[in-house]
Structure formats: structure tokens, C-alpha cells
């Protein structure tokens, strides 16, 4: 296997909080997939959840080589955890099509946060 895409991003959690305070759940609906939304409505720390999803999706879109645009939107990049808690990425719609075009066979994800920032790294291999 060889690396075909690397994306890294970080965001100040206060930035996400301010966006959320301005737009509320409209912001959450814009960036979350249907499955992520189902988890979001059940959690207490919504700002941290949104910050990690936002930063991970930015990193994933960079790894795809597209960035977030009119075709590849936030809600087409779905993050979840496997049974052991490892973060995983699922491509949907146009993002899935793009991942097939670049022959993505393996995805590596790391997401972290601390008091002020959230970070993510996504590596795609063929």
C-alpha cells in the first residue's frame, strides 16, 4: 500500500462554540451525517463533539484532495468508533465516489482534543 492522501487540521474549540451560539443546531445539521446527528442529540458536551467532527471532516476532505466544496460536503464524511473505540471514517455520496476514483483502500484516523483545541489527522492508502 502507498499513501495517496494526508490531511491534518486543528481548530480552536472557542471558534466552534461561537459558531454554535450564533447558529445553534443549524450548524450541527450542516456538518453532521444522519448517524452522527443521532449521537449528537444524546450527548452532554455538544461543543467538544462538534469541534472534533468539524476538524476531522476538514482533515478528511484535505486527504481526499478536494477540501470541503459544493460537491464534497461535511455530512458526506461520517466518523464513528469501532467496538474498541478506534475512530473510523465512512465516505458517503460524492465523497464515496471520489474515494473510489483515487482507489482508497485503507483509512487511518486520529482525533484528539484538549481544553482549547481539537486536532485530526487522516491518512488514505491505496
UniProtKB/Swiss-Prot annotation:
Report the subcellular localization.
Cytoplasm
Q: Which GO terms describe its molecular function?
A: holo-[acyl-carrier-protein] synthase activity; magnesium ion binding
Task: Kindly give the SUPFAM superfamilies that the UniProt entry links to this protein.
Answer: 4'-phosphopantetheinyl transferase (SSF56214)
Catalysed reaction equations from the record: apo-[ACP] + CoA = holo-[ACP] + adenosine 3',5'-bisphosphate + H(+)
Q: Where does Mg(2+) bind?
A: 9, 58
GO BP terms, alphabetized: fatty acid biosynthetic process
Q: Which top class of enzyme applies to this chain?
A: transferase
Protein's UniProt keywords contain Lipid metabolism: yes
Enzyme Commission number(s) of this protein? 2.7.8.7
Q: Name the coenzymes or cofactors required.
A: Mg(2+)
Q: Which UniProt keywords apply?
A: Cytoplasm, Fatty acid biosynthesis, Fatty acid metabolism, Lipid biosynthesis, Lipid metabolism, Magnesium, Metal-binding, Transferase
Q: List GO terms (cellular component aspect).
A: cytoplasm
Q: Which domain of life is it from?
A: Bacteria
**HAMAP family in the cross-refs:** AcpS (MF_00101)
NCBIfam families the record matches: acpS, pantethn_trn
Protein name, as recorded: Holo-[acyl-carrier-protein] synthase
Identify the coding gene.
acpS
